[in-house]
Amino acid sequence: VSAATEHGPDGSRLLGRTVPIRAYNLFRAISKYPQLLPQMRSTFLDVLVERGLLSREELAAAAKARVEADGLPAARETLADYTDALIDMAFAEWLSADEVENYINLVRKRDRCQELGRVLSGSHATAETVWRALKEFCDIPKGEIYISPEEAEGIRVSLLSFYVSSQLPFLGIAKKYVTIRDISAILEHTLGHVAYPGRLGGKAAGMIVAQKILLPILAGHDPDFERHIAVPDTWFISSGVFSDFIDRNDFHLFHTHKYREREAFDAEYQLIGERFESASFSPDIIAQFRRLIEEIGEHPIIVRSSSFLEDSFGLAFSGKYQSVFLANQGDVEARLAAFVRGVKTSLASMYGPDPIIYRRDHGLLDYDERMAIIVQKVVGRRLGDYLFPFAAGVMYSRNCYTWSPKIRKDDGLVRLVFGLGTRAVDRVGGDYPRMVPLSHPL
């Protein structure tokens, strides 16, 4: 537009103070995204109208007046070009540079959000295509203006279902606390297979949601205490690695093991463990394991199970699967070999007698169970060549040990021990656990 600088009855009063460099900077910024120009102009105009800075009628009159002043025919295309230019100039005039950038990024986020939703809803979605679409969304600066709650909630549910857990009770809670960018951050610490989407399992799901709910509450109510509460450095191995391992080594018949008679479980499970021990992961997975071991360094770790059913609503599976502690000392190859053995042990525990009997007792035997893995640094203090974990425990939402009428069952119970958590789960004989009713903890 040649000049929209004078005031007058043609509707250009709001365009009279435009600083040319600001309008030019805005146009240069939005020109980087030519496919989004219509959406950006539409958003800009909506903002101007909502703030009472410009009406649609005023804009149309200003565009028509400028076309006539320049001696051009009032063709539809010409009017559209002038209208777009006047929107840009008005937006640059009335909004700060930071606001302009926020609204440009809002349009970009909406566009990438729609693409992410399209990929997630497709029947051929893979871990790679979803991750690429998610990363494109998260690469856009967060800014101070967000996509609508409805858009965000739909994408959150789809991502959580795709990557973490599809259980409806979990999704109903997690979608309120776990953001799209949170999921991206989790995946930055996830190992997986490109051909198998996989999920992170029930234990991982519970950890993620508990962290997102509890830490902000502590920060708001007791910041001094919150400083001492931290989630250990954590990595996830998705169930896609388990699926690839089963396919690669032709272990599909092991899925029928759960239908055998109880007397055959122990011998069969020992055979499965031996077969897992001699089996191999794909070279790509081993390469990911090696990078993880190098990243962790020489620090003790725990390899933890996270099956789809584990720690789900109404189903604890406490102590049913194997967790493996590793000293993780020495050269990389030795640590890698020990890590691979630990992962195999944890994966094989899905076929153990305890979880299968538990599933049978709860009517879950026909469920297509899968296993993911959580890898965490062991928390403790070093003393010479040793690492001493301070304390661990198991928390129950219902307290069945009410040794006093004052204790409220529904407030829960903590079984607290010194040292590693296995002492709380396995109830080691001769140990000294502390049973703490949460209704009366002191």
Show which residues each predicted segment covers.
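Terminal amphipathic helices with adjacent charged low-complexity linkers/tails
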Residues: 231-259, 263
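Non-catalytic, well-ordered alpha-helical scaffold segments
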Residues: 21-24, 38, 42, 76-84, ...
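Alpha-helix initiation/capping motif
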Residues: 37, 55, 68-71, 88-102, ...
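Conserved mixed alpha/beta core segments that line enzyme active sites in large multi-domain catalysts
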Residues: 152-222, 276-442
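Metal-assisted phosphate- and nucleotidyl-transfer catalytic regions
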Residues: 262-284
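Glycine-rich phosphate/pyrophosphate-binding loops
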Residues: 214-242
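N-terminal, non-catalytic alpha-helical interaction modules of very large eukaryotic scaffold proteins
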Residues: 1-176, 182, 291, 300
